């Protein structure tokens, strides 16, 4: 039950990331570029936009190799083989959200494997000591106290008085 809840959480997180990208960037420009430059290369030699988004308009498609072609969209309109621009944009957005969601689920699995490995080997191995410091929010704000060095290279140990909860006293620095 908890695995499916985690999967749903990461799916929702992936959809939120896609929505944030769409709000922060000009997603229409990205989808228009995909629609006008990439799809004509995939559809054939004539480089015609076979969509019905503008039947009576002339589409100027400039491919990457530099030729410029002017095509009347009303001559190349196919009812059965065409997919509208909105459907392509929807499929592209869903695919992007799906990929981001599965990436987040994979990252969740990697983190769980790392935590399991750390818990299994923490008594015997010191290589996973960074993980609890990384995951602990309480330790995130604290700076590690390092001993100061004198100019001669001798170590000077600074002794601080601490409160009962482990925080340094501001009066005895």
From Swiss-Prot:
Membrane-protein topology: Multi-pass membrane protein
Coiled coil (UniProt feature): none
Residues that bear Phosphoserine: 169
InterPro entries in the record: TMEM240
Keywords: Cell membrane, Disease variant, Intellectual disability, Membrane, Neurodegeneration, Phosphoprotein, Spinocerebellar ataxia, Synapse, Transmembrane, Transmembrane helix
Residue spans crossing the bilayer: 5-25, 90-110
One GO CC annotation: cerebellar climbing fiber to Purkinje cell synapse
Pfam hit, one: TMEM240
Domain of life where this protein originates: Eukaryota
Family designation: Belongs to the TMEM240 family.
Associated pathology: Spinocerebellar ataxia 21: A form of spinocerebellar ataxia, a clinically and genetically heterogeneous group of cerebellar disorders. Patients show progressive incoordination of gait and often poor coordination of hands, speech and eye movements, due to degeneration of the cerebellum with variable involvement of the brainstem and spinal cord. SCA21 is characterized by onset in the first decades of life of slowly progressive relatively mild cerebellar ataxia associated with slight extrapyramidal features predominant in older patients and cognitive impairment predominant in younger patients.
Protein name in UniProt: Transmembrane protein 240
Gene name linked to the record: TMEM240
């Amino acid at each position: 039950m908890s695995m499916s809840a985690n999967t749903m959480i990461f799916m929702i997180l992936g959809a939120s990331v896609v929505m944030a990208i769409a709000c922060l960037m000009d997603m229409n420009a990205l989808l228009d570029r995909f629609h006008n430059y990439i799809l004509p290369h995939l559809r054939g030699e004539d480089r015609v936009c076979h969509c019905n988004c503008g039947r009576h308009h002339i589409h100027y498609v400039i491919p990457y190799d530099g030729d410029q072609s002017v095509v009347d969209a009303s001559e190349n309109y196919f009812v059965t083989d065409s997919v509208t621009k909105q459907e392509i944009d929807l499929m592209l957005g869903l695919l992007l959200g799906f990929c981001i969601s599965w990436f987040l689920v994979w990252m969740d699995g990697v983190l769980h494997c790392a935590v399991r490995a750390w818990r299994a080997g923490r008594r015997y191995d010191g290589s996973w000591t960074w993980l609890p410091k990384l995951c602990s929010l309480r330790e995130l704000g604290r700076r590690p106290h390092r001993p100061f060095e004198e100019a001669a290279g001798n170590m000077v140990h600074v002794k601080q008085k601490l409160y009962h909860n482990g925080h340094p006293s501001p009066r005895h620095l």
